[in-house]
Amino acid sequence: ICLALPLPGDEVQQNWTHFVRIGAYGLSPTNANAITVDARASNVFGIEVDNDIPGRYESFLEPTEKLAAIRRVAQKTHEAGNKAFVYIAGTECITANADKAAHSVVKDHPDWLQRKITGEPAVFTGGAAFWIREGDEDVWISPYATPWRKIYMERVRQIAATGIDGIYVDIPYWMTHFDGWEDTWASFDDFTVAAFRASTGLDARNDLKLGNFTDPSFRKWIDFRIATFTDFMREIRENARKVNPSIMVIPEIYPGIEQEAVRVGADVYELYAVVDAIAHEY
């Protein structure tokens, strides 16, 4: 019997995302060391930190303070022999106290917003979801909003450059999961409609029988919506790895194979090829 054994230098390093025991922490400018100490004490390997840059309008515009905090936690984590990854939103963006603020996404960039076919924008206030506080503005942005996407990918590169081990992208979806939006098959904003026309020659506002899976044009809309977020996640990883070749990109996708995958436009079977791991929330 002949056994082929690997030589000492031939070991393949296992992907750390495959065997982590994670803990989640809110990251501030001053608590990086405390996070690392607590993670060690509780046998955490794989520290998730909440310090969302693109999903909060203030830091989307000015990320310096949060980037410094991410850099500190990455350094402390590595000194302890651990790994850390940071949460960012997909297409959602919240402006704190928008009812009193001079600037918000809606006030500054209403054309960026996802929309129903009726034109209603994806804008929500306190009570629409548990994480949206009274006075805050919560919006969902079209991934085809070119100026937004350019800044978003710049923020991804800046985050990756901190040395953090991973980026956790929360639900990169079309807005079809809040009350009143489930059957909209959004988005019908100008950016998205133009991209669909360029891809298929069809007018999304007039050529589709929404919800009718026997309609060939609607099926093209379904495929287009899924391809959109597959390409979005691919671009996130490409941008992150330009500055940090070993960084991991991990989207959170709660649908599996059920109908919600088609509605929100995130198909895990398409995404596996363009990300490093997928987090499921059930």
Locate predicted features.
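Active-site mouth loops of central-metabolism enzymes
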Residues: W16-A32, E137-I151
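Active-site beta-loop-alpha junctions enriched in small/polar residues
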Residues: Y25-L27, D52-P54, A89-T91, P172-W174, ...
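Catalytic domains of carbohydrate-active enzymes, especially glycoside hydrolases
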Residues: L27-R56, I159-G166
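Aromatic-lined substrate-binding rim segments of carbohydrate-active enzymes
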Residues: D50-G90, I94-T95, S104-V105, A240
